[in-house]
């Protein structure tokens, strides 16, 4: 019995398993092992390494074993094909590939055909998987085998043998320049609504297919993915982190177009656009010019699905990264008054953060400063909605005025003057005592709340499972300093500092909440005049 196999077997479900597993995979090709013993361990090994990043090492180990000890590899292959375990059968491609690298007389094409013509679906899958280990020149040099693969793939697609489609996509992707009709077959498969199939298409776009050399087929496959369901998280993750990353700088219009088509395919998806927030934020940080253009064009779109999507993306984005929202100057410069009015209305209807509302509308003012109608409408929006709800906007305008042209400064001064006068008059109004709450009623109200607070406090104190029982580090304060004791050791003393935060809530919500919501609802449902 081989020591390397015994050591691995004895460490199953123990802490030292992973050290033994790594050593086993590194040294397997040098060891004289009993294949039957090895095969009997494989189900246990696969169970142990399931969903672990090191799971690939067993495939590399079997590949090297078959290359350096081809007789063992052939014995292993002949016994693997009789196994029923799906996980264990996945070692077949690595085994065949390793044997083919050795100098023994071994016809891998015959063995591949044996697997591909097998009545057992699991063995046929491994036959397709083995094809991926071949090289383009091997298929070019063996036209008979290449023709055999072409006919087999065509038959499986026509017969809708869907269990093989994910493997077929990998084969077609690798040999797209070799196999006849590979493009057409990939396009056909990309139209199938199957998470497994669409994942393989996305994986192909991520790793195998080069956009610059396969531009037409790449775009067709990409836009066929517009059908993907928002619940296909693994596909969306590949799009966000691999596919779209290729286009953020040089071809952002592809991302823009894909997201539009994805939204229009099912307009109920507007709220699910947040699944692509990573791409949205990457565009904002790495290609701000196109980001501005994209946001501006979506706000100017007639279909409200784009307004809802932009609102969702912006509202859910990290607030520290989206303190301002400027729109695209070139795009805005080509618009007429009605189009500018439409965009401003949608900003007010769909965007809620004061920083984003005022900065986006102010960026429009700077571009359309020579259009009297646009200026008057924007002034009205500032006066009646933005400054009315957020008086601090006056301070914002004062700062922006310093960086603006004289024409813009003139308009800003008009807005500031009107609103300062308004707030001065508001502050001069006398309080009417009849509208003040009763002191007696307030006393009773506060007493009830105080009693409830005391009850809750007592319940928390008496609860043995209180959150405070989880606290292991006790903070100690001395003078102006603070230190703590952690695992029996006192930390260095640090000086305490004051933490303060403030927020400006919209005035209109306190004065007339229903009226404010009515304004936003009207603006959200506003349609462009024809």
Predicted regions and their residues:
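Non-catalytic all-alpha helical scaffold/repeat segments
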Residues: 1-530
């Amino acid at each position: 019995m081989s020591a390397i196999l015994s050591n691995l077997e004895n460490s199953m479900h123990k802490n030292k398993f992973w050290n033994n597993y790594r050593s086993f995979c590194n040294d397997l090709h040098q060891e004289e092992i009993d294949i039957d013993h090895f095969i009997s361990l494989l189900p246990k090994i696969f169970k142990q390494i399931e969903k672990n990043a090191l799971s690939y090492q067993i495939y590399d180990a079997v590949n090297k074993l078959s290359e350096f000890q081809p007789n063992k590899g052939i014995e292993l292959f002949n016994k693997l094909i009789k196994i029923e375990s799906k996980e264990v059968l996945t070692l077949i491609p690595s085994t065949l590939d390793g044997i083919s690298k050795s100098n023994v007389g071994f016809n891998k094409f015959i063995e591949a055909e044996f697997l591909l013509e097998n009545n057992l679906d699991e063995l046929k899958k491994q036959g397709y998987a083995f094809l991926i280990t071949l090289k383009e020149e091997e298929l070019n040099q063996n036209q008979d085998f290449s023709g055999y693969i072409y006919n087999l793939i065509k038959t499986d697609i026509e017969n809708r043998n869907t269990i093989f489609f994910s493997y077929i996509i990998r084969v077609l992707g690798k040999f797209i320049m070799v196999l006849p009709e590979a493009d057409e077959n990939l396009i056909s498969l990309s139209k199938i609504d199957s998470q497994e199939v669409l994942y393989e298409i996305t994986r192909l776009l991520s790793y195998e297919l080069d956009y610059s050399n396969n531009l037409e087929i790449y775009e067709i496959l990409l836009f066929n993915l517009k059908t993907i369901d928002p619940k296909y998280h693994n596909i969306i993750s590949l799009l966000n982190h691999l596919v779209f990353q290729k286009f953020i700088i040089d071809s952002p219009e592809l991302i823009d177009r894909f997201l539009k088509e994805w939204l229009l395919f099912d307009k109920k998806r507007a709220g699910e656009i947040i699944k692509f927030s990573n791409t949205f934020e990457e565009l904002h940080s790495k290609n701000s010019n196109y980001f501005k253009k994209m946001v501006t064009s979506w706000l100017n779109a007639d279909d409200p699905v784009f307004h809802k999507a932009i609102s969702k993306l912006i509202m859910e984005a990290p607030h520290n990264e989206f303190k301002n929202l400027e729109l695209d100057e070139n795009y805005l410069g080509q618009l007429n008054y009605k189009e500018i009015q439409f965009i401003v209305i949608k900003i007010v209807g769909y965007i809620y953060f004061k920083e984003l509302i005022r900065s986006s509308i102010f960026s429009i003012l700077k571009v359309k400063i020579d259009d009297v109608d646009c200026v008057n409408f924007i002034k009205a929006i500032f006066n009646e909605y933005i400054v009315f709800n957020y008086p601090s906007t006056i301070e914002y305008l004062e700062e922006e005025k310093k960086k603006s042209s004289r024409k813009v400064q003139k308009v800003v001064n008009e807005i500031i003057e009107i609103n300062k006068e308004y707030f001065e008059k508001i502050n001069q109004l006398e309080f009417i005592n009849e509208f003040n709450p009763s002191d007696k009623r307030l006393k009773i109200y506060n007493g009830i709340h105080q009693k409830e607070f005391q009850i809750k406090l007592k319940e928390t104190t008496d609860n043995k499972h209180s959150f405070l029982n989880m606290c292991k580090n006790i903070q100690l304060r001395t003078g102006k300093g603070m230190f703590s004791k952690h695992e029996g050791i006192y930390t260095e003393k640090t000086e305490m500092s004051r933490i303060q935060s403030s927020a400006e809530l919209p005035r209109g919500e306190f004065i007339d909440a229903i009226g404010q919501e009515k304004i936003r609802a009207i603006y959200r449902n506003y349609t462009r005049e024809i």
